[in-house]
């Protein structure tokens, strides 16, 4: 079993919360952090108990003050830059797990432009659009520097698409890739088709 070179950031409050939960379990139990459907739009992160007999040879161990976290090797790259916190609010406390790379593993700075733009869409833009039930797909980047996008989900047939494209998505992409992208174009036909909401 390997020791991890990079830790997942678990706040002191979250570590104390895990320790309290682990104290009720069989001795030697730790936690497991994992991603279901990693690298897809449906990726979901989770934390579970990891009794001693559930540790796999290929697991990566991250040691914290009072426990260890085990991560399977498939989930590991998708948990890069992940953060776990335990937030107390008026209505109670809850564990938060942010994993910006769960849906798509991080791409290198020198990766082809289309891969870097796709990464930004999946990790930054689509999570915002998901609040409205929408999503965008990158179709291609034209030779003259335009990202061609397809809107889907709740965005399809929505009259706000032009505003969303121009004000939100295009601005965000151009500001992140100022020397490489001139703008964004939409290939979705925004006539009200039978799949659209009225």
Curated annotation (Swiss-Prot):
Keyword 4Fe-4S (UniProt): yes
GO molecular function, one term: iron ion binding
Protein name (Swiss-Prot/TrEMBL): Fe/S biogenesis protein NfuA
Statement: the UniProt record of this protein carries the keyword Iron: yes
Keywords: 4Fe-4S, Iron, Iron-sulfur, Metal-binding
Residues the record lists as binding [4Fe-4S] cluster: 155, 158
Cofactor(s) this protein requires: [4Fe-4S] cluster
PANTHER family: FE_S BIOGENESIS PROTEIN NFUA (PTHR11178:SF51), IRON-SULFUR CLUSTER SCAFFOLD PROTEIN NFU-RELATED (PTHR11178)
Gene Ontology biological process terms from the UniProt entry: iron-sulfur cluster assembly; protein maturation
Family listed: Belongs to the NfuA family.
Function: Involved in iron-sulfur cluster biogenesis. Binds a 4Fe-4S cluster, can transfer this cluster to apoproteins, and thereby intervenes in the maturation of Fe/S proteins. Could also act as a scaffold/chaperone for damaged Fe/S proteins.
Origin species: Haemophilus influenzae (strain PittEE)
TM ranges: none
Cofactor binding summary note: Binds 1 [4Fe-4S] cluster per subunit. The cluster is presumably bound at the interface of two monomers.
Self-association and partners: Homodimer.
């Amino acid at each position: 079993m390997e020791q991890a070179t990079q830790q997942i950031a678990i706040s002191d409050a979250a570590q104390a919360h895990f320790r309290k939960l682990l104290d009720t379990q069989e001795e030697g139990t730790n936690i497991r952090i994992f991603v279901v459907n990693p690298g897809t739009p449906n990726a979901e992160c989770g934390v579970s108990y990891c009794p001693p007999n559930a540790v796999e040879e290929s697991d990566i161990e991250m040691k914290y003050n009072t426990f260890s976290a085990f991560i399977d090797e498939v989930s590991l790259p998708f948990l890069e830059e992940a953060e776990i916190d335990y937030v107390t609010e008026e209505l109670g406390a809850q564990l938060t797990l942010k994993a910006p790379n769960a849906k798509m593993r991080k791409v290198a700075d020198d990766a082809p432009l289309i891969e870097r733009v796709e990464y930004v869409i999946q990790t930054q833009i689509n999570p915002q659009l998901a609040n409205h039930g929408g999503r965008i797909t990158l179709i291609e980047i034209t030779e003259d520097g335009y990202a061609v996008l397809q809107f889907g989900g709740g965005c399809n047939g929505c009259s706000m698409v032009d505003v969303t494209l121009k004000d939100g998505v295009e601005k965000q992409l151009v500001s992140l890739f100022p020397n490489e992208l001139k703008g964004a174009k939409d290939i979705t036909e925004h006539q009200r088709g039978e799949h659209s909401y009225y």
